[in-house]
Design a protein with these regions (language model features):
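Positively charged, small/polar-rich N-terminal and surface patches that mediate targeting and assembly
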Residues: 1-112
């Protein structure tokens, strides 16, 4: 099993969710986050004063998939989140030792 975490632009969330759903990926966790990378920040004017906005709003999604479903999940996220501009985000994949469904006690891939 794999944990897939992606940091994407907020306006791409619905497209990513729909793309994952089409591939049979059920359930994801969404967290609003802020960050910066190559995109860096920008300057804004507020009441005549300049402010540097270093951290930009992003969305972090987390899904757990079987090893067999990993490639299609990553590809779905990448294709749906891509705009071709700096700041599109990143996808991280890690091994997952164990999953337990709290309600039933099922574990492993049965809990997905």
């Amino acid at each position: 099993m794999k944990m897939v975490m992606a940091i994407i632009k907020p306006f791409k969330l619905e497209e990513v969710r729909d793309a994952l759903s089409e591939k049979g990926v059920q359930g994801l966790t969404v967290t609003e986050v802020k960050g910066y990378g190559r995109q860096k920040g920008h300057t804004e004017l507020y009441r005549g004063a300049e402010y540097i906005v270093d951290f930009l709003p992003k969305v972090k999604i987390e899904i757990v998939v079987s090893d067999e479903d990993l490639d299609k999940a990553v590809e779905s996220i990448q294709n749906a989140a891509k705009t071709g501009r700096i700041g599109d985000g990143k996808i991280f994949v890690t091994n997952l030792e164990q999953v337990v469904r709290i309600r039933t006690g099922e574990d492993g891939e049965k809990a997905l």
